[in-house]
Amino acid sequence: MRIDIITVVPDILKSPFEASILQRAIEKGLVEIHLHNLRDYTTDNYKQIDDYQFGGGAGMVMMIEPIDKCISELKSEREYNEVIYMTPDGATLNQKTANSLSLSENIIILCGHYKGVDQRVRDQFITKEISIGDYVLSGGELGAAVLCDSIIRLIPGVLGNETSALTDSFQDNLLAPPVYTRPSEYKGWEVPSILTSGNLPKIEEWRENQAYERTKKLRPDLLDDE
């Protein structure tokens, strides 16, 4: 998979890909991350990428020309499955979306800033708009990092245990069950005995029941979506 991220501040996006699972995925050649500074696609001496709104109003708007140049250059080199715009207006990121995007070969992610992008960018180039929640950040970079993490960990070979991602919360519209590790007793707090019994069918049944009860208590809305 190749992910091209268009941003005004590429430095924000360097560190997430230089550690842990994402770094290993890149080193294994399972994913390529390419950061594109939008200012490199400007034509003026000031490298301007934003301007005042037509009709007046507070806040600057990202200009269409440098975005067009960047996206068009990338598209001239390869085909892309999606051109994604990170925006609070978008559909909230969920596991279903991450699962779907993880099957893509090439993705472009555009990070918004200021009051957002000229609407013509959204009309002409964007195929999917994604939000990471009903709140506003200074830019789309952190959202892009979250999106990339949620996608990359699903690519076969990225995680050490191939079944690990399949048992994460939300994969079956359920939260994950409680998990425990050694020691089996600590300060009088004991691990449920079923988990140390060695009875795998009973353990699986316990986990399914716990996942359902936990979801019912903490996220009943997920059960309503079934």
UniProtKB/Swiss-Prot annotation:
> EC?
2.1.1.228
GO terms assigned for molecular function: tRNA (guanine(37)-N1)-methyltransferase activity
Any idea which UniProt keywords this protein has? Cytoplasm, Methyltransferase, S-adenosyl-L-methionine, Transferase, tRNA processing
Q: How does it assemble?
A: Homodimer.
Q: Which reaction does it catalyse?
A: guanosine(37) in tRNA + S-adenosyl-L-methionine = N(1)-methylguanosine(37) in tRNA + S-adenosyl-L-homocysteine + H(+)
BP GO annotations? tRNA N1-guanine methylation
Question: What family does the database annotate?
Answer: Belongs to the RNA methyltransferase TrmD family.
Positions that bind S-adenosyl-L-methionine:
G112, I132, G133, D134, Y135, V136, L137
Could you tell me where this protein is found in the cell? Cytoplasm
Q: Which SUPFAM superfamilies match?
A: alpha/beta knot
What does the function comment of this entry state?
Specifically methylates guanosine-37 in various tRNAs.
- Where does the source fall among the domains of life? Bacteria
PANTHER family membership: TRNA (GUANINE-N(1)-)-METHYLTRANSFERASE
Q: Does the keyword RNA-binding apply?
A: no
Protein name from the UniProt record: tRNA (guanine-N(1)-)-methyltransferase
**One GO cellular component, as annotated:** cytosol
Primary location recorded for the protein, binned into one broad class: cytoplasm
Does the record carry Repeat as a key word?
no
